[in-house]
Amino acid sequence: MTKTPPAPEPDVLFGATDERQFIPQQQTPAAAPAPAEDAHYHGHRDRLRARYREYGDAALADYEILELILFRLIPRRDTKPIAKALLARFGTLAGVFGAPLHLLHEVKGVKESVALDLKLVATASHRMLKSELRNKQVLSSWSAVIDYCHAAMAHETKEQFRILFLDKRNTLIADEVQQQGTIDHTPVYPREVVKRALELSATALILVHNHPSGDPTPSCADIEMTKLIAEAAKPLGIALHDHVIIGKDGHVSLKGLQLF
């Protein structure tokens, strides 16, 4: 009886053929598991988005609102430390969005593109608030005026002098920044203010400037400058309705204090 010879052992060398001309298929190595850190922040992002979708902003802390914005700006990094660092540096969401670009850059993890996008959010907010003043009598929408001016100016690091030009119905014609000054002074020239009002056919003005210190208390120079502008405008039929000083801590109306 003839014995069947044993089958040859397969070649142990990768890629070599056995006697049956069989080429072993190369095994694709299993994908490495995602780092635990990646899995952590992706899961956190999903949970935070779900909470916002279901409950709205009332369910989120300020740093979590910032996180939601930073998710798209910084797609592959844990943004919670950056959001908390921004709030620690600038105090509030308004402070973060109102901060100048060069100060935003000083926060670790905030590159130029991120800082620009944060400022874009602030710009959209300002435009939204300003749109509330269009085609409305400004004096009857005073809270909207204050909200807009506070958003636009309260967190500026230098003094800024802004004028709201109104027509005879007290509707906003133009909103212009006339001067940028130092941290505690802005040069203002009454004749230039009146000249611009005449160019726009404005019949009334509201002056607004900020105090970067945060304290909106008017200085003697603020009061004197207001009186000079009122005196220059009055003979030309231009009324000065108010001069509002904006600070991080609130605002002051010189008209309300009967200072001119």
UniProtKB/Swiss-Prot annotation:
Zn(2+) binds at H209, H211, D222. A motif (JAMM motif) lies at residues 209-222. The keyword Disulfide bond does not apply. GO terms for molecular function: metal ion binding; metallopeptidase activity. One of its GO terms (biological process) is proteolysis. The keyword 4Fe-4S does not apply. Keywords: Hydrolase, Metal-binding, Metalloprotease, Protease, Zinc. It comes from the Bacteria. InterPro entries: MPN (IPR037518), RadC_JAB (IPR025657), RuvA_2-like (IPR010994), UPF0758 (IPR001405), UPF0758_CS (IPR020891). Residues 138-260 form the MPN domain. PANTHER family: DNA REPAIR PROTEIN RADC, UPF0758 PROTEIN YEES-RELATED. Belongs to the UPF0758 family. This is UPF0758 protein Smed_1459.
